[in-house]
Structures are given as structure tokens and as C-alpha cells.
Design a protein with these regions (language model features):
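Extended, low-polarity segments enriched in aliphatic/aromatic residues
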Residues: 152-156, 160-180
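DUTPase catalytic domain/fold
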Residues: 3-4, 9-11, 17, 57, ...
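Short, glycine/acidic-rich beta->alpha junctions
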Residues: 41-46, 142-147, 180
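Aromatic/His-enriched, Gly/Pro-containing loop or helix-boundary segments
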Residues: 30-52
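Intrinsically disordered, low-complexity linker/loop segments enriched in Gly/Pro
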Residues: 66-156
């Protein structure tokens, strides 16, 4: 996608597992999905978006007008990982979201307010030789001046984040969406 400075873009990010992780899926199916792509990174991202006339040295402002949630969300944890692997052995937990009230029922007596934000928001990197890069491909795990996996709840509807353009076109990427 190519856009001009000031354009508004609607982005439908792809959920983890390419949208195949849904309520009712089991651990074996998750492992099959995750193993389907060789050398898969930890996050599913959407992009790049090329901004016409954006050049290294420019500053790119990304403003979030609105974040619209789907009807359900999943929490995926690698087997034996996470904060409490013994207490929560399930790899996938699904939650139905009340997008009108912007809340989720965590348990029968617990409602959690939803405040969605992108976990990954980034621009293209000029340095693709660092410790988080292999053969010119960089992991989304390590944040830096290009953005990346920042997991900042402050990046909500109405916020603007500024990134130094490092490559022609800026190359905007986003994904790993959360709803704190």
C-alpha cells in the first residue's frame, strides 16, 4: 500500500496464527499452525505501508483515530511458559468481548475494561545487521528508535506516536494487538 502524508488508512491487523486461533482450538492445532511457517517470528504484523516522499531524516507522525475490536480475543501461551504455567496449563484461552460496553468477562464475577492498543508499531529499519536480525530479517521482539514491540498502553485511540524515518517510504508495520 502506498499513501501520501496526511492520508487516513484503515488497517485490519491479522491476529496471531493468521486468524486461525479461535475459540475451541486445541494445543495440537496451535502447534501445527505455529510450525507451518519456517523461521516464524513471535508476532504477526501487517504492513509495510509506504509513505510517498518520506525519506531518512524525516519524522513520521502516526495518529490512531480509532481501534475497533473483534467479537472475541485469545490469549496464547507457549506450552510451559508464561507467568503461571502450572496454574494455567492451557495454551489458548478465548474471551468474548462486549465491544459496546468495551469490557470482557474474565470470570463470572470479574469484568475487565478494554483499552485496545497495538503491541507492535514500527517503521522500517536501516540497520538490519544487529543481534535481533538474521540475513536482513529482523525480529519484532526488540524495540528501538524504529518502534517495534513496545506494548505501550498509552498508544490508544487519539494518540500520536513519532518515529524517525530510516528508509525511503518509512514502511509502517503494526500488529500484536492488545486490549488491556
Amino acid at each position: 500500500l502506498r499513501i501520501d502524508s496526511g492520508d487516513t488508512v484503515a488497517i485490519q491487523t491479522v491476529p496471531a496464527g493468521g486468524g486461525q486461533v479461535a475459540p475451541g482450538i486445541n494445543e495440537g492445532q496451535i502447534e501445527k499452525i505455529n510450525g507451518a511457517v519456517h523461521n516464524r517470528g513471535p508476532h504477526t504484523v501487517t504492513g509495510p505501508i509506504y509513505v510517498n516522499n518520506a525519506e531518512p531524516g524525516d519524522l513520521l507522525a502516526i495518529h490512531i483515530n480509532r481501534i475497533q475490536l473483534p467479537m472475541y480475543a485469545t490469549n496464547n501461551t507457549a506450552k510451559g511458559k508464561g507467568l503461571f504455567p502450572d496454574e494455567f496449563p492451557e495454551q489458548v484461552t478465548s474471551y468474548y468481548l462486549d465491544t459496546d460496553k468495551m469490557q470482557m468477562r474474565f470470570s463470572p464475577n470479574v469484568l475487565v475494561p478494554l483499552k485496545p492498543f497495538p503491541g507492535v508499531l514500527a517503521v522500517g529499519r536501516s540497520d538490519t545487521t544487529g543481534p535481533w536480525c538474521t540475513d536482513g530479517k529482523c525480529s519484532t521482539e526488540q524495540p528501538g528508535p524504529y518502534g517495534g514491540n513496545m506494548d505501550l498502553p498509552e498508544m490508544q485511540t487519539g494518540s500520536t506516536t513519532y518515529f524517525p524515518v530510516q528508509v525511503n517510504g518509512g514502511l509502517i508495520w503494526t500488529g500484536d494487538s492488545h486490549a488491556k
